[in-house]
C-alpha cells in the first residue's frame, strides 16, 4: 500500500476503535445508573422470556383480566402520590400468575360479603424504586432500599384496600394510601372502631390466601415465597408487547 493509503486506513481503524470504546463506556455508565448496586435484575424481553421457560409461574398477567371486578387506582401513573410526579407511563397493574390467582380467590370471597378489592400498585419496575429512594432522600422507612430491591419489583407485592362495589367507595381505613405516619402501622390502635375493623378484615382475608403484612403499611401485602421471583426492570409497554 502507498503511504497515504496506509495512513488513511489507520485513521479509519483508530476512529472505529474509538467509537467502539465510547459505546462500551456509555453502556457501562448506563448500566451503573440503572443498576448501581449490581443486583441480579432482569431488564430485557429475552431475559424475561427465558425465565418463563424455566417456570411458567414467572409470567406477569394483567390483574384486570384475572380478577373480575377489581378496581384500579394506580397512583404512580398520576401526580397524586407522595412524589408529586407521574412515575408510570400507564395505569396498569401486573403481577406474577400465582399472585393473580390468589387475588382472584380473594375477590370471589369478598363478593359474598358485598365487598371488593381496589389496587393502588402491583408490579413496579426497579427504576421506580430508585426514583422513590431519591425522592425520599435515602429514608427507607416507607420506601424500599434499592440495594435490596422491593418485592414490588419481583411482581409479588400489592397495595390494596377494600371497597363497596355498589358505589366504588373505599371502606374507612386508618389512613389514606401512602400515608407515611405512625397511623399507617398495622398495630396502631388509636383509631375509629370502624377503621380498625376494616383493617383487620383486609389483613385476615389477605393472609388466609397466602399474603403477609409489613409493620408500617396497612395496605401492603407480599405473596408467599416472594424471593423465588427475580427482581425486574421491564416496562409495562414491554410486557404488553410480549403478551401480544
Predicted features along the sequence, with ranges:
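Conserved metal-phosphate-binding beta-hairpin within the catalytic cores
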Residues: 221
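Segments that shape or occlude catalytic/ligand-binding pockets
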Residues: 125
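Extracytoplasmic cell-surface/polysaccharide-interacting catalytic and binding patches
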Residues: 28-120, 135-216, 225-244
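Bacterial Sec-dependent N-terminal signal peptides
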Residues: 1-37
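Short active-site loop/helix that positions an aromatic residue
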Residues: 132
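Short, well-ordered surface patches within globular domains
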Residues: 128
Amino acid at each position: 500500500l502507498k503511504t497515504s493509503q496506509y495512513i488513511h486506513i489507520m485513521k479509519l481503524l483508530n476512529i472505529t476503535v474509538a467509537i467502539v470504546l465510547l459505546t462500551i463506556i456509555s453502556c457501562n455508565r448506563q448500566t451503573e445508573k440503572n443498576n448501581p448496586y449490581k443486583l441480579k435484575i432482569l431488564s430485557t424481553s429475552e431475559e424475561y422470556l427465558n425465565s418463563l421457560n424455566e417456570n411458567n409461574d414467572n409470567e406477569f398477567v394483567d390483574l384486570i383480566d384475572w380478577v373480575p371486578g377489581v378496581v384500579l387506582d394506580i397512583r404512580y401513573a398520576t401526580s397524586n402520590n407522595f412524589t408529586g410526579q407521574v412515575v408510570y407511563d400507564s395505569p396498569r397493574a401486573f403481577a406474577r400468575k400465582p399472585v393473580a390467582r390468589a387475588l382472584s380467590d380473594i375477590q370471589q370471597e369478598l363478593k359474598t360479603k358485598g365487598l371488593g378489592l381496589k389496587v393502588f400498585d402491583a408490579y413496579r419496575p426497579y427504576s421506580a424504586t430508585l426514583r422513590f429512594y431519591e425522592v425520599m432522600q435515602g429514608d427507607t422507612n416507607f420506601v424500599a432500599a434499592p440495594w435490596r430491591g422491593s418485592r414490588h419489583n419481583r411482581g409479588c407485592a400489592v397495595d390494596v384496600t377494600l371497597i363497596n362495589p355498589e358505589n366504588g367507595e373505599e371502606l374507612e381505613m386508618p389512613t389514606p394510601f401512602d400515608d407515611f405516619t405512625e397511623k399507617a402501622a398495622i398495630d396502631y390502635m388509636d383509631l375509629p372502631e370502624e377503621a380498625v375493623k376494616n383493617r383487620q378484615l383486609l389483613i385476615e382475608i389477605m393472609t388466609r390466601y397466602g399474603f403477609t403484612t409489613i409493620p408500617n403499611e396497612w395496605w401492603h401485602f407480599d405473596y408467599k415465597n416472594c424471593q423465588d421471583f427475580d427482581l425486574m426492570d421491564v416496562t409495562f409497554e414491554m410486557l404488553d408487547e410480549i403478551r401480544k
